[in-house]
């Protein structure tokens, strides 16, 4: 199938984080939501959708899947679209993410598991009812509602940043685990290679909101539960950084690089209502109308606008990827009036070879 909007991904391998099934307290789970396709954008129904996985999975009506998808993204270089250099003002963030990131090193064994480490740069997600944590999971896939001994307590970071903590030894069944480890009632790093809890991404993308309502963009808790609970809220007329994962040095899933995935709710949906595991037909969370992808590898930033197979309805805004002043973006990518650029339903990806680009909501 000819995909005029398809871009070269230069033989890199990448896994696009996808949300796991919703789980209750102390419930073991092995299922994952779909991470789709290889070489071409293919969804569970065989339609071309998004570059992410080398094993297609079939999604049930409730958004669960029956198998775990691995991922190798290899897009043909012959499908690269024309290079564009677009002028677009890069708005400054409405709030400084660095102010909440925290500059102090995390000290093992000094903070109780019952206390959320807000002063260390982690962002508390109070609406989830987990004491501020994004998820709480042990190596066997059991979950809990409070951070306790033997569990990994995963957390969110400010927009533009990603967590640094996950154990090098991961479950053999394809699940991912991340966060601080609770032992003897105290929190410990699960990745002792770094003393900080959050790391800045590549800094090559922002979300720019030109519509009248706030937009809750919800990143997946990855490695971890993979639920879409990590918030980036972009107020009307403002902008926020998008965390572009530095794939070459970040978490790898079974030896494959991973990028970031964001579920975008309709404008006007609050973060408390939108950055959750949604229910069928709700239009929020994993049922949000559009998904974004972002990753940086081998000197190139890749940005995507992706259909959500759970929700075929168009959002109450349009979206396009636009180069910032002086930047170079290969390809064109937009979702306007319910139609993606290119074939109309496949989603689209651009490569930023220099500078940065904006996801513009209008």
From Swiss-Prot:
Key words of the record: Autophagy, Carbohydrate metabolism, Cell cycle, Cell division, Cell wall, Cell wall biogenesis/degradation, Glycosidase, Hydrolase, Membrane, Mitochondrion, Mitochondrion outer membrane, Polysaccharide degradation, Secreted, Septation, Signal, Stress response
A biological process from GO: polysaccharide catabolic process
GO MF terms, alphabetically ordered: hydrolase activity, acting on glycosyl bonds
Localization (cell): Mitochondrion outer membrane; Secreted, Cell wall
Keyword Cell division applies: yes
Record-listed E.C. numbers: 3.2.1.-
Organism: Saccharomyces cerevisiae (strain YJM789)
Family per record: Belongs to the SUN family.
Gene from which the chain derives: UTH1
Function: Involved in aging, oxidative stress response, and in the regulation of mitochondrial biogenesis. Inactivation of UTH1 increases life span, leads to higher resistance to heat stress and to hydrogen peroxide, and increases sensitivity to the superoxide radical-generating drug paraquat and to copper. Also required for the selective autophagic degradation of mitochondria (mitophagy) in response to nitrogen starvation. May play a role in cell wall morphogenesis and septation.
Protein name per its UniProtKB record: Probable secreted beta-glucosidase UTH1
Disulfide bridge positions per record: none
Pfam family, one: SUN
An example Gene Ontology CC term for this record: fungal-type cell wall
Topology with respect to the bilayer: Peripheral membrane protein
Main location: mitochondrion
InterPro entries for the chain: Beta-Glucosidase_SUN, SUN
Keyword Mitochondrion set for record: yes
Signal peptide: 1-17
Top enzyme class: hydrolase
